[in-house]
């Protein structure tokens, strides 16, 4: 009985001590918003450094306790050979920040990014030390890891991390509190868990926001120019494309004929919903024919222009 009382008293004292040392925790709703410009610059810098690791700093603002806004990044003159990068060049950083302020970019450093070409998004022991030095300057600093090898068009392999406080681990508390159902955490992979995810650091939500100017920039990335029409295509390849387009047109024409026969037996109300959510054979046939005609007209004109120019 005495032993049970001593055990209950020790648990009570631990609870009182934990309550006395209670401190504000980060929230699982906290999201890192990365602009399109910053994301493109990170990917371009990371791809240029393959197979080496590269790093840079992120500029932005801490809007509130739930939002970290990244508007721009700039590369640092460092590279790594393994899973780590060298220390940050303070002189280069100071000069770069002064030059950016002259151009009107007066945001503060909200964290850093580096690449892991081909081996996923996680933090090595040296990366953890680098992140700890950033968090000594600002406790909300963010470490972003991007993998340029695994990233493909439409899906960027990227993740954001922040260290777990050792005091939280000692008190056996959760590193973050959950106050809303907003936000979606990605399911961690085995590789990240092996390298200390949710033990030494945790992952943050990432979202992307686009302004009207950035949206216009992205729409013009793969926009064809007037020189594209003067490019000659291989005649055998062009013949194969035309043959496939002709076979496709025949199939669509058969579907269109079948559609006309079916429409004779349908009521007016059934006709209105006949092709809702389905492919309209008439519209599809018209689009295919117009595209084939345009491509062949351009091809013939290009061949004529090139033959005259070569003479």
From Swiss-Prot:
Pfam families cross-referenced by the UniProt entry: JAB, RPN11_C
Cellular component, GO, one term: cytosol
Motif mapping: JAMM motif: 114-127
Residues noted as binding Zn(2+) in the record, renumbered to the chain: 114, 116, 127
Entries under InterPro entries matching the protein: JAMM/MPN+_dom (IPR000555), JAMM_MPN+_peptidase_M67A (IPR050242), MPN (IPR037518), RPN11_C (IPR056263)
Disulphide bond pairs: none
Domain MPN: 32-167
UniProt keyword annotation of Ribonucleoprotein present: no
GO biological process, one term: proteasome assembly
Record key words, sorted: Hydrolase, Metal-binding, Metalloprotease, Protease, Proteasome, Zinc
Source superkingdom: Eukaryota
UniProt GO molecular function: metal ion binding; metal-dependent deubiquitinase activity; proteasome binding
Family statement drawn from the similarity comment of this UniProt entry: Belongs to the peptidase M67A family.
Task of the protein: Acts as a regulatory subunit of the 26 proteasome which is involved in the ATP-dependent degradation of ubiquitinated proteins.
Name of protein: 26S proteasome regulatory subunit RPN11
GN (gene name): RPN11
């Amino acid at each position: 009985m005495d032993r049970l009382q001593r055990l209950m008293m020790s648990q009570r004292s631990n609870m009182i001590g934990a309550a006395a040392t209670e401190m504000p925790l980060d929230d699982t709703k906290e999201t890192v918003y990365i602009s399109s410009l910053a994301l493109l610059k990170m990917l371009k810098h990371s791809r240029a450094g393959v197979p080496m690791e590269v790093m840079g700093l992120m500029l932005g603002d801490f809007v509130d306790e739930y939002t970290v806004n990244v508007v721009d990044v700039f590369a640092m003159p460092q590279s790594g050979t393994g899973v780590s990068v060298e220390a940050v060049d303070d002189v280069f950083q100071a000069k770069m920040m002064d030059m950016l302020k002259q151009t009107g970019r007066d945001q503060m450093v909200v964290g850093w990014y580096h690449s892991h070409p081909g081996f996923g998004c996680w933090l090595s022991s040296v990366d953890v030390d680098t992140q700890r030095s950033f968090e000594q300057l600002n406790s909300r600093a963010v470490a972003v890891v991007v993998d340029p090898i695994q990233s493909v068009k439409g899906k960027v392999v990227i993740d954001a991390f922040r260290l777990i406080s050792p005091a939280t681990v000692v008190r056996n508390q959760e590193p973050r509190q959950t106050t809303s159902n907003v936000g979606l955490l990605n399911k961690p992979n085995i590789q990240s868990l092996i390298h200390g995810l949710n033990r030494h650091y945790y992952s943050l939500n990432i979202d992307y926001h686009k302004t009207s100017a950035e949206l216009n920039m992205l729409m013009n990335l793969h926009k064809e120019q007037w020189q594209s029409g003067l490019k000659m295509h291989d005649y055998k390849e062009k013949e194969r494309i035309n043959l496939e387009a002709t076979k496709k047109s025949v199939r669509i024409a058969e579907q269109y004929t079948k559609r006309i026969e079916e429409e004779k037996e349908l009521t007016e109300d059934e006709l209105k919903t006949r092709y809702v959510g389905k492919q309209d054979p008439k519209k599809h046939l018209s689009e295919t024919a117009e595209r084939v005609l345009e491509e062949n007209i351009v091809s013939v004109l290009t061949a004529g222009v090139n033959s005259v120019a070569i003479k």
